Amino acid sequence: MISSKPRLVVPYGLKTLLEGISRAVLKTNPSNINQFAAAYFQELTMYRGNTTMDIKDLVKQFHQIKVEKWSEGTTPQKKLECLKEPGKTSVESKVPTQMEKSTDTDEDNVTRTEYSDKTTQFPSVYAVPGTEQTEAVGGLSSKPATPKTTTPPSSPPPTAVSPEFAYVPADPAQLAAQMLGKVSSIHSDQSDVLMVDVATSMPVVIKEVPSSEAAEDVMVAAPLVCSGKVLEVQVVNQTSVHVDLGSQPKENEAEPSTASSVPLQDEQEPPAYDQAPEVTLQADIEVMSTVHISSVYNDVPVTEGVVYIEQLPEQIVIPFTDQVACLKENEQSKENEQSPRVSPKSVVEKTTSGMSKKSVESVKLAQLEENAKYSSVYMEAEATALLSDTSLKGQPEVPAQLLDAEGAIKIGSEKSLHLEVEITSIVSDNTGQEESGENSVPQEMEGKPVLSGEAAEAVHSGTSVKSSSGPFPPAPEGLTAPEIEPEGESTAE
């Protein structure tokens, strides 16, 4: 009788394969048999690709090579982790290995070291990108590779840059060059800058001296700024004297006068006041001076105009542009006048020195007073004085002196010239008849221009002159400016 039940045919090698997986499960004892079985067959398939042999021999050899290692517990955990996601097993198992190898290479260490050095040198430019890239590199690697970056090997000195460079702009080279340029401009050529400022701050009028007196003339240059800055004035002559002149600010100082200038007789017309020329030394025996003076009587300005002062060997003539004041010396006594007198006359002062002085002054205020024995002229102006003095010829060389704290000038010789900013000229009829106890005259400033011997008179804008060879009368009351006290006629007579 024929049975209707079909006959099942077992494929070749199925029994051997099932026996192999059963042995592997028994030896390794995995927690998840399904994942382990999948990993087993995957490894077996990969292993079979390398060899072409019978299934029985393949399973037997696979057990000897792979399953025996799994039974020791070295790789089953890794196999189980790989079995969690069978589709990504190969990718995940290879990427961490490659990153680990890349972080251990020498090239990676070198690049990270150089990058850290750059970050230290230029934090303002590379700090943010460096941080982002470091974080990116750390995120790509499965193992922490930051210790190598945080502790780089010994680096060159640029890593020891001071922290202040971390806050400089993006281009520190330009900033440094700019700062150095400013410093050099401040510290270089200070005298030139001062001279330029002075020259442009006030008009300057220069008169030429006749050729017959050129050998003996001395031009004094005293450029001053109305704001009261202390400037350096060089007095150069045959004795090469260096004088420093200081100015003090006054309440009633004003802008330089722009009144039209009236030339003296037999002299050239002064240049226009368009732009003040830069003061320079004309010769070894010439010095140019520009002084700002202001005259006040009882804190009230008296007159304003342009004054040209010409001092000849026997007289001083001061013609004014708007108003000309004349003050003649009288031997007879007159009562002291408290109020200033201004009259359209020329000012004449007899002098005893054989020197010839010519000065052109731009005057703002002038005050004239007559006393019993004194003649005074108060002036405050900006002037350029050309002085010719024969008594200065042949004097011993006087070294340059520095300006003291009070703005006075000290020259260590009796035959010296002291210059000041303010001027008050007092002429005495008979200074020789005065008592010897009145030699000293109170001055608002310590510096006094002193001319030796015959040089008793001088008209300096912003200066005071005192003769060293005769007594001096006391200053009259009610005067607000320093005084010029030239020696009287008694020395010549």
UniProtKB/Swiss-Prot annotation:
Keywords: Calcium, Cell projection, Cilium, Cytoplasm, Cytoskeleton, Flagellum, Metal-binding, Nucleus, Phosphoprotein
Bias (Acidic residues) ranges: 484-493
List of residues that carry Phosphoserine: 155
Record field: compositional bias (Basic and acidic residues): 101-117
Consequence the record notes for mutating residue 146 to A: Does not affect phosphorylation
Gene Ontology annotations of biological process type: epithelial cilium movement involved in extracellular fluid movement; sperm capacitation
UniProt feature, compositional bias: Low complexity: 141-152
UniProt biased composition (Polar residues): 90-100, 426-442, 461-470
Stretches for region Disordered: 85-164, 244-271, 330-354, 426-493
PTM description: Isoform 1 is phosphorylated on tyrosine residues during in vitro capacitation. Isoform 3 and isoform 5 are phosphorylated by GSK3B in vitro. Dephosphorylation affects its ability to bind calcium.
Coiled-coil regions, chain positions: none
Domain RIIa intervals: 12-49
Primary location: cytoplasm
MF annotations from Gene Ontology: calcium ion binding; enzyme binding; SH3 domain binding
Phosphothreonine PTM sites in chain numbering: 151
PANTHER family, A to Z: CALCIUM-BINDING TYROSINE PHOSPHORYLATION-REGULATED PROTEIN (PTHR15494:SF0)
Job of this protein: May function as a regulator of both motility- and head-associated functions such as capacitation and the acrosome reaction. Isoform 1 binds calcium in vitro. Isoform 2 and isoform 6 probably bind calcium. Isoform 3 and isoform 5 do not bind calcium in vitro. Isoform 4 probably does not bind calcium.
Subunit structure: Interacts with FSCB. Isoform 3 self-associates. Isoform 3 and isoform 5 interact with GSK3B. Isoform 1 does not interact with GSK3B.
Protein name from the UniProt record: Calcium-binding tyrosine phosphorylation-regulated protein
Native source species: Homo sapiens (Human)
